[in-house]
């Protein structure tokens, strides 16, 4: 099992709020703003606390259970909403993750799939790595016959700045095991992930 993945679950993110607040104040000054004026006086502290919250995943215990029923079809949690921060611009991106697996000997509580998404989303990220990390975590902890993750997200670094194309969605996928290698299972997963409710 990958020690880095276990570490991510078991350790809390250490944030120096005082230092972050000082840095936010310096940023405001560098942008030509007066951090001592009425509207900005509390802003550096708010920025520090907001980023600390956005970048601190909730630790959880990855409880798994024996697959006593021998369930051998896909398990998919669709439309898991998430928000993250682009590591290039520190601007938010968010959307939905569709996470599925083909059980082997172990299964996991459905709520844990949402927690896994948050575990990796609540850090500085790029969407491609986020997608792969979620798939790797499920593969490591469950040892399923296959894993599929599809993420669709809007990036504010693309909507608010640069090309300024609001509403543009980026889709990424990470497929492993039979979800990648078996054409029928792959097609079923992708169809279920794309299905509109």
PLM feature segments, named:
Residues 1-197:
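A domain-level signal for the structural core that forms small-molecule/cofactor-binding pockets
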């Amino acid at each position: 099992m990958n020690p880095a993945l276990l570490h991510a679950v078991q350790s809390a993110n250490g944030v120096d709020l005082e230092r972050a607040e000082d840095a936010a104040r310096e940023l405001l000054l560098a942008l030509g703003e007066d951090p001592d004026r009425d509207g900005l006086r509390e802003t550096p502290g708010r920025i520090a606390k907001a980023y600390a919250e956005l970048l601190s995943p909730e630790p959880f215990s990855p409880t798994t259970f024996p697959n006593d029923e021998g369930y051998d079809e896909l398990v998919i949690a669709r439309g898991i909403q998430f928000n993250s921060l682009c590591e290039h611009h520190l601007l938010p991106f968010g959307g939905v993750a569709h996470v599925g697996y083909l059980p082997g000997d172990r299964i996991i509580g459905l709520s844990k799939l949402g927690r896994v998404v948050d575990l990796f989303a609540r850090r500085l990220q790029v969407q491609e790595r986020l997608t792969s990390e979620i798939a790797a975590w499920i593969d490591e902890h469950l040892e399923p016959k296959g894993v599929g993750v599809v993420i669709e997200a809007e990036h504010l670094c693309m909507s608010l700045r640069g090309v300024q194309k609001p509403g543009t969605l980026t889709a990424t996928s990470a497929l492993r095991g039979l979800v990648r290698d078996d054409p029928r299972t792959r097609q079923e997963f992708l169809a279920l992930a794309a299905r509109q409710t």
